[in-house]
Regions:
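Active-site beta3 strand of CheY-like receiver
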Residues: 47-53
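Active-site residues of response regulator receiver
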Residues: 9, 55
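Receiver (REC) domain active-site loop signature in two-component systems and cognate sites
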Residues: 58
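Two-component/phosphorelay signaling modules centered on CheY-like receiver
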Residues: 3, 12-32
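Helix N-cap/capping motif at the beta->alpha junctions
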Residues: 33-42
Length: 62
């Protein structure tokens, strides 16, 4: 069983690094990414992930 996961961070390099770190865990399936709070809410509502990695400080919405 995989953990359907979303990554949310306004810094592209942070998302890339997190994706790299999670790649060694076959049970983690990254189903989407968002770069801001509004997109994150839409993504989470649409995809209903099991797990979300969230940046706590982002422009517009924290």
């Amino acid at each position: 069983m995989s953990l359907r996961t979303v990554l949310v961070d306004d810094e592209r390099l942070a998302r890339l690094e997190l994706r790299r770190l999670l790649a060694v865990h076959p049970q983690v399936e990254i189903i989407g990414e968002a770069a801001n709070g509004d997109d994150a809410l839409a993504l989470i509502n649409a995809q209903q992930p099991d797990l979300a990695f969230l940046d706590v400080r982002m422009p517009g919405m924290d």
